[in-house]
Structures are given as structure tokens and as C-alpha cells.
Amino acid sequence: MNPNYIILFFLVVAVIVLFYFVGSSVSLWIQALVSGARVGLLNIVFMRFRKVPPKLIVESKIMATKAGLDISSDELESHYLAGGNVSRVVQALIAADKAKIELSFNRSAAIDLAGRDVLEAVQMSVNPKVIETPMIAAMAKDGIQLKAISRVTVRANIDRLVGGAGEETILARVGEGIVTTIGSADSHKHVLENPDLISKRVLEKGLDSGTAFEILSIDIADVDVGKNIGAELETDRAEADKKIAQAKAEERRAMAYAREQEMKAQVEEMRAKVVEAEAKIPLAMANAFEKGNLGIMDYYRMKNIMADTQMRDTIGSPDRETPREK
């Protein structure tokens, strides 16, 4: 094979590869050149080898240059390689510059890498955001439940976006303040008559400390009367006391019944002793006759007394029927 053809083949392949890498980069280089953004052609070419999208970097560089910001392409590349959103950061810097808010590229990149939306934060610094809390229920000292909904106007604090708490913390603190204010009120009517009292006391607590926001105002949107929790608690307590009293009464009744049965058993026991003693009387009389301690007249006198006693018992018995009833 002719060596010239081999050389020609390699030259064609080299031209194709060069055109692939340089062709698209030339258009971006010309675009940056006419826009006043200084980005070297070789720098654009080697961005592909660094796995950096040249189009994104060049367009972001042009955007910053047109806005009067001096940001190097190396800073944009490093932020992209760190996993940041380059276009979002540049847009945030432009918005901050127009709003006269001091924000450096490093600060903006740090906010973006921290997971915050830096552009939204800048916009919230210019146009405060209104956050509506869910319905919060609390009970005043008179036992009446109140349900309140508030609207919190917040502004992003650029200096505390990194490491500062988010909206959830603001909502939780505002809810805690509302519950505390309502709970400290002597009467629910006082809160209904002065709903701004809640806003004033909550604002005095400095709830935005340690957060990424600055609370501008807290407005009570709605206050409704809920349940009479105090009355419900008293009812439940009375019902519990009633059940306790019933249990104690049942216990006393059971003890009284047991005592009654015990006394009946004792009565029967005493009757048995009486019967036993009566059964011994004939034996005692026989012994008295043998020893001469009891005479025949004494015996008959005792029998007469016993007969009279039995007759009186029979006459006085309520179960005895009269002759007319028969």
C-alpha cells in the first residue's frame, strides 16, 4: 500500500477529530469574544477533557459580563465541579447587584452548595415572603379552646442562610408563641377582643434568632372558639369520682352483707349452746334428786312455773289463731 495514502488517511482522521473538538468550541469562543467575555479558545477546548460543559460556562460568563460582574471562568468551573448550579448562582449575583445587596461569588456559591436556593433567597430579601401557619389550638385559663391561624411575613437573611434554620423552625416557634399567649390569658374573651395581643407578644420573643429569616410581622388571620375543654375535664373528673364512689359503696355493701352473715352464724352458734345447756337440765335434776338437793315439791313447783311460762309464750305469740279466726 502506498505510504502517501496512509499518511493522508491519518491526516483526515486528525482533521475530523480536531474539527470535532475545536469546531463547536470556535463558535462559543467567537460568541464570548463578541460579547466582551474573555474566554480562551484552548480553555474552551480543554473543558471537555475536564468534563465541564463549555456552553454552560461560556453563557454564564457572558451573562455575568453583561451585568458588569467580574467572575472568572475558573471560578465557574470549580463551582460546577463541586456540584453547584452555576447559572443559578450567576442569576442570584445579578439580582443582588441590581438590588444593591452585597453578595460575593464565594458567599453565593457556599449558599448554593449548602442546598439553599440562592436566587430565591435574594428574591426574598427584596420581596418578603408570607408564610401561613396551620390552625393552632390552645386553651385559655377559663377552659375555653381557641383556634388561631396566623400569617408570618419573613425576609431572607443572606448572612445566616448557611447554618440557619428554615421555615419549619419559624412555624414551630410562632405556634409555640401563640399557644403560650393564649394559655396565659385569663379569659378567651380577652384574646378575641384583642387578637393583636398575640402578635405583639410573639414578636417580642425574638423568634427569628438562629434562623435564615428575619420576621417582619405576624398577623392573626382568624381566631375561632373551639370546645369547652375545662367543662369536659370537669365532667370526666365527676364521672371518675362517681365510679370511685360506686365502687366504694359496693365494697361497703359487700362488707355489711358479710358482717350480717357472720352475726347470723354467731346467733345460730349461741342457740346451739342454749339447746345444749337445756339438754343438760334433766341430768342436773337427776343428780340433785340423788344428792338430796332437790325435793319433790320443788320439782313440781318448777314444773308449774315452766307450764305457766309456756302458756304465756303461747298466748303472746303473733302466730296464735283466735277462736273467731278459726
Swiss-Prot record:
Keywords: Cell membrane, Membrane, Transmembrane, Transmembrane helix. GO terms for cellular component: membrane raft; plasma membrane. The chain crosses the membrane at residues 6-26, 27-47. It comes from the Bacteria. Belongs to the flotillin-like FloA family. Found in functional membrane microdomains (FMM) that may be equivalent to eukaryotic membrane rafts. FMMs are highly dynamic and increase in number as cells age. Flotillins are thought to be important factors in membrane fluidity. This is Flotillin-like protein FloA.
